[in-house]
Amino acid sequence: MALSAYFLLCLSVLGLDAIYGFGFRNGFLELMANSYRERKLSGTAEPLQGNITGTGLDELLGNLIVFYWPVLDGNHPGLSLQAFHFLGAIVAVWVAIQVQSWRSPNRNSLLRSPTLFAMLSQVVAIAVIVPLWCAISIWSSSSPRPITRAVSASAAHSIRLIPISMVLGFGIPTIGMLLPESTHQNLFSKQIAIAVWQIWPIYVALWHWGLRVLFRSRLKEGISVRTACRTACSFAFVCAIIPHAVSWGLSLTLIPTNLLADVLPWQFAGGGTVQVQSMAQGGLWFLQWDHLIGMGSFLLWAMHMRWTVEQQSSFLQTCYLALKVGVLCLISGPCGAAVWLLWEESQF
């Protein structure tokens, strides 16, 4: 058990180097810093809004706007496609983490605060925070019981509200950020929309709290814990599989060589000679490594949970599980495979 947790901690350190160490060595972080200092968005003549909150947070928000601008401006299809692919996995993994936070043994632990981890992932990187959360989850697990046996009946109502709170708290700010600026320029700018989106975990938490208060009268009604958990799991799996299938389908069927070349190769994070040619290229490598390490870690955690429940698996069962994971990764990506495994073994 401890070995899996230590391995996940190593992946968190690897994520830190793949994101920031590699970004420093290939010049991406320097490009971001220069763009922020010049108060100009990369590749455009549009000035960077430097006074959004009037506090020290403006420097952080300014750098985040610089990063996300090429993702959203529509001029870099490979980068936008990777972001779309990643977006579904982000929703799926945080739905799963929220469900896990309602496990009875974790109610008074650090894992009870998924909003904190989600905000840290926004500021640091998913490749750093998700492996860290997975390691803490393994250390704090008091029993191998499936989650449907560990969740109280009252908590099942809260779990049932997680998909709705994600749609409202994550979906609405995301739509506002993705819409062309011409559709809302009289209300707010694209840069403001990017800044507002950054704290989506807080919106999700507020929506979830509000819905729980609103539907408090229904808490006494009977609800199947398994039904609530599987509903949340099904929502997470759909969020993972659709962007995965669409992004890879477009890459493999439309066959624009420049787009396919952007999506397929993985630049080695340890290489010190490769240099980014633009903010878009650096952002693509950033998202690729963030996606790979973050979601790969989550899959390893899900497999650990599966093996913990099935403590007497035979060699053939282990081979079958490995084959199943491979097929699921092809169909839905590593995050979708993790969600499926957890749902299948009633971990949700």
UniProtKB/Swiss-Prot annotation:
Designated name of the protein:
Terpene cyclase ctvD
Q: Would the keyword Signal be found if you checked this record's keyword annotation?
A: no
- State where it is primarily located: membrane
Q: Which domain of life is it from?
A: Eukaryota
Localization per record = Membrane
Query: What are the record keywords, sorted?
Result: Glycoprotein, Isomerase, Membrane, Transmembrane, Transmembrane helix
Q: Does the keyword Membrane apply?
A: yes
Instruction: Show the GO cellular component annotation of the record.
Output: membrane
Query: Which family is this sequence assigned to?
Result: Belongs to the membrane-bound ascI terpene cyclase family.
Q: Which GO terms describe its molecular function?
A: isomerase activity
Sugar-bearing residues?
A: N51
Q: In which pathway does it act?
A: Mycotoxin biosynthesis
Use of this protein: Citreoviridin inhibits mitochondrial oxidative phosphorylation by binding to the beta-subunit of F1-ATPase. Ectopic mitochondrial ATP synthase is a factor that mediates HIV-1 transfer between antigen-presenting cells (APCs) and CD4+ target cells, and citreoviridin can completely block antigen-presenting cell (APC)-mediated transfer of HIV-1 at the APC-target cells. Inhibition of Ectopic mitochondrial ATP synthase by citreoviridin can also lead to suppression of cancer growth by activating the unfolded protein response.
**Per its database record, what is this protein's job?**
Hydrolase; part of the gene cluster that mediates the biosynthesis of citreoviridin, an inhibitor of the of F1-ATPase beta-subunit. The HR-PKS ctvA accepts acetyl-CoA as the starter unit and catalyzes eight iterations of malonyl-CoA extension and four iterations of SAM-dependent methylation at C4, C12, C14, and C16. The KR and DH domains selectively act on the first six iterations to generate the hexaene chain.
How does the protein associate with the membrane?
Multi-pass membrane protein
